[in-house]
Regions:
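Conserved AMP-binding/adenylate-forming core of the ANL superfamily
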Residues: 91, 109-169, 186-191, 251-257, ...
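Conserved AMP-binding A3 loop
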Residues: 122-130, 269-270, 277-301
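Conserved AMP-binding/adenylation subdomain of ANL enzymes
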Residues: 300-321, 331-373, 387-388
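Gly/Ser/Thr-rich phosphate-binding loop
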Residues: 339, 343, 373-377, 386-453, ...
């Protein structure tokens, strides 16, 4: 529910981090971009928020509609209907449109397996629009033959293989909303989602590969299905073909066997613009996961438009090769591996495995071999690459790269600059994209040909997005004053609800600041009009009457030469009310706890923060640690850190932790 430190949510957060570096778009890049200057962006943005209906109508006209809409928007807060009465199909716009235009032979997906083939070369597959279309139609017929009808929720739990894309597009083709579960989740997560989504069918794999080991996906499904009797059908794609996989007669079917007899003719269902396209569960920091609902027309239009603008995609550039390193099990993968990319007719690279398999240079080796032009990853990955060492990057020619993207959490300026210099060769614009599972697509981001970027800022609102930083009464706060980020107008890919929980939808997003969408992030706007995310509003800490964004302190810490990564939380403090606790991963081996070297290092880190941000931001506790408690999606579990910092017993659920042993280590770290 609402922020635990909600006392601070409405008042102003003081922003102390000053960043003066500016990176204008390279002229060479800007001249051919979709949006070529900040003036052009500003003029387009103004028009898009002043007259949204004509703006969105124009964007939506670039897609195939079986029947046109009668009204662009029907808005009854918090319920939006976009492109009312319009009939369309996501899979049709991804595949058939390219084929109809005579371009079916072009590459839609390039897939690379984690392990090499028997010849020692990495296994790469090129899937054209026509190839995908054929398999998608066949699998759509398989689903129908298994009794799946329009509106039935299909659970998908697979590794990062082309068949995952095929399964999701097949669902989209027949109007069966998919509910994709990240392949790193366990049996109980499957059970919860199957139950919540009332899904009777699961599509999975026997196993998937991760760091050359087999993740037993089918075993996990089997275990989940001992805990619910909702599922009567399981379809299994055999990826690993390992021994011991159990098949239950009547319930379990092999993908290949079903596909062998399936027809490749399957008309795309003419779906209503507001038909449910998918459910995707997002954890929220407490309670049971929320099934975020996205619908067909609005999501399609927004995902594809934002992909095109943010990455400046160009279908007519034969060298274009886009790579997003996320897993399709997250919204980033839904929107920016599949649904935003295929309608733009740009090849999307899909990688099966881990970034350090077989070595820490895997990503850079792939960028070089595939001549990747647009690359999209997360700050946590960037910091890992920094820690692994520049030599793994320097081995490779990365000169094909043109735009670099980041998403998922605030990027600290040190990581931003490293990404810019080491990966981008100081020539690639960086797009720091702020958005959420709930928003469906990018909300705040630079446009690479238009925006002068500054490290750590996600810059400007996307076209059509009316974002602002306000106090809890919804009034805009002055520049450089922290407040609550809100979106004041509806946009096409906004969530339509939480599956089965109307009240939670209304309370979570629409009641914190009445009349506005509230994503629960704190932010400020600098005098140039650039947005800075200061962290979740429940991460804001109030120290001696000053409100501080934890992210700013983390950034200051990470700019210390001995710090690789830092997480900052508040803890009860006798004098200040709230003290600042910092959990720090050091560069290289940490000095042993309690040693003079450790104490000296902590002192130097404290002094550094005081120098960067002012003494008020100086941590009261620093704990040197070798790891931070993270969920499998890479988010730091801050509530857990708060309990550790306060010396409280751990009562919360730690089952989503990537490595559970780390809790004891942190408690011992003192
Ligand atoms: C939360 C949403 C959107 C796909 C990945 C995460 C944080 C996301 C940024 C960014 C600062 C960011 C926010 C947001 N976040 N991108 N560029 N800068 N913070 O999706 O799991 O729905 O999480 O991630 O706190 O609310 P998600």
């Amino acid at each position: 529910m609402a922020a635990s430190d909600s006392s601070s949510a409405g008042s102003s957060t003081e922003s102390m981090l000053q960043e003066s570096r500016r990176f204008p778009p390279p002229a060479e890049f800007a001249k051919d971009a979709h949006v070529t200057s900040i003036e052009q962006y500003e003029q387009m943005h103004r028009r898009s928020v002043e007259d949204p209906e004509s703006f969105w109508a124009e964007v939506a006209e670039g897609f195939h509609w079986f029947e046109p809409w009668t009204k662009v928007l029907d808005w009854n807060l918090p319920d939006a209907k976009w492109f009312v009465d319009g009939k369309t199909n996501l899979a049709y716009n991804c595949l058939d449109r390219q084929i109809d235009a005579g371009l079916g032979d072009q590459t839609a997906i390039v897939w690379e397996a984690e392990s090499p083939g028997s010849d020692g070369q990495f296994v790469v597959e090129h899937w054209s629009y026509a190839d995908l279309h054929r398999e998608v139609c066949k699998f759509a017929n398989v689903l129908k033959a298994q009794g799946v009808k329009k509106g039935d929720v299909v659970t998908i739990y697979m590794g990062m293989i082309p068949q995952l894309a095929i399964a999701m597009l097949a669902c989209a083709r027949i109007g069966a909303p998919h509910s994709i579960i990240f392949g790193g989740f366990s049996a109980s997560a499957i059970r919860d989602r199957v139950e919540d989504g009332q899904s009777r069918i699961v599509v999975t794999c026997d196993g998937s590969y991760r760091r050359a080991k087999i993740v037993p996906l089918k075993d996990n499904v089997d275990e989940a299905l001992t805990m619910t009797d909702r599922v009567d059908t399981v379809i299994v794609y055999e990826r690993t073909k390992h021994d011991g996989v159990n098949y239950i007669d009547g319930r379990d079917h092999k993908w290949d066997a079903l596909m062998a007899d399936a027809s490749a003719d399957c008309d795309a269902e003419q779906l209503d613009s507001e038909d449910l396209a998918f459910i995707l569960y997002t954890s929220g920091s407490t309670g049971k996961p929320k099934g975020i609902m996205h619908t067909t027309g609005g999501y399609m239009v927004y995902a594809a438009m934002t992909a095109k603008l943010t990455f400046d995609l160009n279908a007519d550039d034969p060298n274009e090769m886009y790579w997003c390193t996320a897993d399709i099990g997250w919204i980033t993968g839904h929107s920016y591996i599949i649904y935003g990319l295929l309608p733009n007719r740009v090849p999307t690279l899909m990688y099966e495995g881990a970034p350090n398999e077989p070595g820490p240079d895997r990503f850079w080796d792939m960028v070089e071999r595939h001549q990747v032009t647009k690359f999209y990853t997360a700050p946590t990955a960037i910091r890992a690459f920094m820690k692994w060492g520049d030599e793994h990057v320097e081995k490779h020619d990365l000169s094909s790269l043109k735009v670099l993207g980041t998403v998922g959490e605030p990027i600290n300026p040190e990581a931003w600059v490293w990404y810019h210099e080491k990966i981008g060769g100081s020539k690639c614009p960086i797009v720091d994209t702020w958005w959420q599972t709930e928003t469906g697509g990018h909300m705040l981001t630079p446009l690479p040909g238009a925006t002068t970027t500054t490290p750590g800022s996600c810059c400007r609102p996307m076209l059509g997005i009316d974002a602002a930083v306000v106090n809890s009464d919804g009034e805009e706060v002055p520049n450089n004053t922290g407040g609550i980020l809100v979106v004041r107008k509806p946009w096409p890919s906004m969530l339509r609800g939480i599956y089965g929980d109307r009240q939670r939808f209304v309370e979570t997003y629409w009641e914190k600041v009445p009349g506005m969408y509230c994503p629960a992030d704190g932010a400020r706007v600098d005098p140039d009009g650039n947005f800075w995310i200061t962290g979740r509003i429940d991460d804001v800490i109030v120290v001696a009457g000053h409100n501080l964004g934890t992210m700013e302190i983390e950034s200051a810490l990470v700019s210390h030469p001995d710090v690789a990564e830092a997480a900052v939380v508040g803890f009860p403090h006798d004098v200040k009310g709230t003290g600042i606790a910092a959990f720090v991963i050091t560069q290289g081996q940490a000095p042993s706890p309690g040693s003079d070297a450790a104490e000296a290092m902590k002192k130097s880190m404290s002094a550094h923060v005081a120098k960067e941000l002012g003494p008020i931001s100086k941590p009261d506790q620093i704990r040197l640690t070798e790891a931070l408690p993270k969920t499998r999606s890479g988010k730091i579990m801050r509530r857990l850190l708060r309990d550790i910092a306060a010396g409280n017993p751990i009562t919360q659920d730690t089952t989503t932790l990537e490595d559970r042993s780390i809790v004891e280590k942190l408690q011992a770290s003192g």
